[in-house]
Regions:
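Conserved donor-binding/catalytic core segment of Leloir-type glycosyltransferases
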Residues: 4, 189-205, 211-214, 227
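Carbohydrate-associated surface elements
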Residues: 143, 165
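Glycosyltransferase donor-sugar binding loop
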Residues: 166, 225-240, 259
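Nucleotide-activated donor-binding/catalytic signature segment of Leloir-type glycosyltransferases, i.e.
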Residues: 238-260
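Aromatic "clamp/platform" in nucleotide-sugar-dependent glycosyltransferases that forms part
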Residues: 281
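Short hydrophobic beta-strand element within catalytic cores of glycosyltransferases
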Residues: 298-301
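Conserved acidic donor-binding segment of nucleotide-sugar-dependent glycosyltransferases
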Residues: 313-314, 318-325, 334-340
Length: 376
């Protein structure tokens, strides 16, 4: 097959999809406004969109929209793909829809349908148009399909749930030697409980709530260490967070990882961690959370529908209000003081991940969807 993706090339999720299909021998093209970043993926033809860069975000959006639409149309005519697959409906999905190319698949990521359309009437119309034009829309969470039907009138027979899942060949326990070296590198003592936030340093992940909880956690457990993985974060917001950390006097308890890290590196960080915190107000069931659970970390997550697909409060996770640092403090301290929960939760979470969220199995499902749409 000749597959053309429209997606953000510096996203680890995009990179996994294009690499999988390229490795399977398909001809893979990726249209993106950004390069791959720190990695290089062989046998994937990257088509970079040219963009204007006005300082004001809204002006940038208005200026780039027609420019990107024209470029995407020209590229699709040049590539002549068998199938188009756009990830993130609010922009790449809209661009793909305007080409009138079929078969055309959309993948909803979460905020592109849960948050962004509520902030802008223009974006809402773009999302509605893209959904209307798509042959199939994939979601990772059960509730997301119901939401698309209820809020956008998308017929159920055009929705397919294919969890992205995680690579269980990478994300698992057993990196003892690497964990030892990482603790030494980060100067974390052997008896120090480790908490990790592996979501991007961005306001939507309620990082500020985590920061406000830390001094209360370290008051009870002074040797507790929190690791922040910056990822594809917001640099201005990161400055605000670092300033607040200094104001609270908790610099010695924080480890910032200011770069993208490979999946293998992430697995070692997660194996090092006792507790994982993920508290956005809207989300699909994030792969980053499942990766942490597969490595044995206790999940503390926001009390939202997405996480309830697999998790139950106090049974294999802890739910909190993402606006409440006090509740986060209490649950984190409870986890630190009850280390036996780590093994109990791990056994439950490992089972559902292996059954339903194995990346290798779900990638095959996506390939089968492509073939069905092409009548092969």
């Amino acid at each position: 097959m000749k597959i053309c993706y429209l997606a953000n090339a510096d996203s680890i999720h995009t990179q996994r999809w294009v690499k999988y299909f390229a490795d399977k021998g398909h001809e893979v093209h990726l249209i993106s406004p950004r390069p791959f970043g720190d990695c290089n993926i062989e046998n994937v033809k990257l088509h970079l969109l040219k963009r204007l860069h006005p300082q004001i975000r809204f002006i940038s959006f208005i200026a780039n929209l027609p420019l990107e639409i024209i470029q995407v149309r020209k590229l699709i005519k040049k590539i002549k793909p068998d199938i188009i697959h756009a990830h993130y409906i609010a922009d790449y999905g809209f661009h793909a829809a305007l080409t009138n190319f079929h078969p055309f698949i959309l993948s909803a990521w979460g905020s592109d349908v849960l948050v962004t359309p509520k902030k802008s009437f223009i974006v809402k119309m773009m999302v509605e148009y893209a959904l209307k034009k798509a042959d199939t829309v994939t979601t990772t969470a059960k509730f997301m399909g119901k939401y698309l039907t209820k809020e956008f009138g998308l017929p159920e027979n055009r929705i397919v749930r294919i969890p992205w899942g995680i690579d269980l060949k990478i994300f698992h326990r057993g990196y003892e030697e690497e964990v030892k070296k990482l603790r030494e590198k980060l100067e974390i003592k052997d008896n120090s409980p480790v908490i990790i936030s592996n979501r991007a340093i961005h306001p939507k992940y309620e990082i500020q709530t985590i920061v406000e909880a830390i001094p209360h956690i370290t008051k009870k457990h002074p040797n507790a260490t929190l690791i922040f993985i910056r990822g594809n974060g917001d640099k201005n917001f990161e400055k605000i967070i670092k300033k607040r950390i200094s104001e609270l006097g908790i610099d010695s308890n924080i480890r910032f990882i200011p770069r993208f890290i490979s999946p293998k590196e992430m697995a070692v960080y997660l194996d090092t961690s006792d507790i994982l915190i993920s508290i956005p107000k809207t989300d699909q069931f994030a792969s980053s959370v499942m990766e942490g659970m597969a490595c044995g970390a206790i999940p503390i997550v926001s009390d939202i529908e997405a996480y309830k697909q697999y998790l139950k409060d106090e049974e294999n996770a802890f739910f909190i209000n993402p606006d409440d640092p006090k509740e986060l403090t209490e649950k984190t301290i409870f986890c630190i003081e009850h280390p036996e929960l780590k093994e109990t939760f791990y056994k439950i979470n490992k089972k559902f991940i292996e059954e339903d969220e194995d990346w290798s199995k779900n990638a095959v499902k996506m390939e089968e969807l492509y073939k069905n749409l092409l009548g092969r």
